[in-house]
């Protein structure tokens, strides 16, 4: 793996990591932050890792930004990761290197080896493509912010919330669903409540903004459009990280 472990205020910048010699077990071929706090990864490019970008084991306050990840999936992999930011990244998920095939994946609470992930993780201004669902949340996820991204999925929904996944804001994203049968957002559990869906555009899929056992608390200004060429969202504030550096006083 290439990640910080048990670290604070560390940086990994301006690097290329090309493949891994072993991908056969837990902890191998990861790129990200493990038991880390307030760390930064910037301008990194990876090829053929298993899980990249990745947060795990209570990583909190970490940022991964302006990076490109080829043939691996984004992960909140274990242990109550919370309040982390992924922004301005490109993730090209693929099967074959040990990734799960989702664009981004968060471990479920019933997984005894990994456990659930915590609140207020943020995905901002990213471009994510995958064979399976764009974002798969296993449960106990609270108040995640999914803003100004493009998700392109060969099959499955744009966002899948399994159970007890609640109070998320999913706003101003573009979802490109190629299978012709999936909704933009699937709320699998009746306890997936308090979710806001605003200003999103669905291209393809089954033409439904949301399906499942729960309904969003707010759904407005969402569009459904035929499958076709799209462009990424262009938020007026491209980077939360840079905005904070400019505007928040020490």
Where are these regions (language model features)?
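Extracellular parallel beta-helix/beta-solenoid repeat domains
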Residues: 1-250
């Amino acid at each position: 793996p290439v990640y910080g472990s048990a670290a604070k205020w560390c940086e990994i910048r301006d690097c290329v990591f090309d493949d891994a010699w072993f991908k056969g077990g837990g902890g191998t071929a990861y790129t990200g932050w493990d038991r880390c706090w307030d760390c930064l990864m910037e301008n990194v490019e990876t090829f053929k890792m298993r899980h990249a970008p990745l947060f795990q084991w209570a990583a909190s306050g970490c940022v991964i930004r302006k990076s490109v990840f080829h043939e691996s999936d984004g992960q909140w992999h274990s242990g109550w990761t919370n309040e982390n930011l992924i922004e301005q990244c490109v993730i090209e998920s693929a099967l074959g290197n040990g990734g799960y095939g989702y664009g981004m994946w968060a471990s479920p609470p019933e997984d005894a080896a990994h456990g659930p992930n915590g609140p207020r993780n943020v995905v901002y201004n990213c471009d994510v493509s995958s064979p399976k669902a764009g974002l798969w949340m296993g449960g106990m996820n609270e108040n995640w912010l999914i803003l100004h991204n493009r998700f392109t999925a060969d099959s499955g929904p744009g966002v899948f919330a399994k159970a007890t996944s609640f109070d998320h804001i999913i706003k101003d994203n573009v979802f490109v669903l190629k299978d012709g049968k999936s909704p933009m957002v699937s709320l699998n559990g009746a306890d997936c409540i308090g979710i806001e869906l605003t200003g999103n555009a669905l291209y393809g899929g089954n033409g439904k903004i949301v399906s499942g056992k729960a309904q969003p608390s707010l759904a407005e200004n969402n569009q459904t459009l035929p499958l076709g060429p799209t462009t990424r969202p262009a938020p007026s504030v491209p980077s939360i990280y840079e905005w904070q550096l400019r505007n928040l006083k020490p």
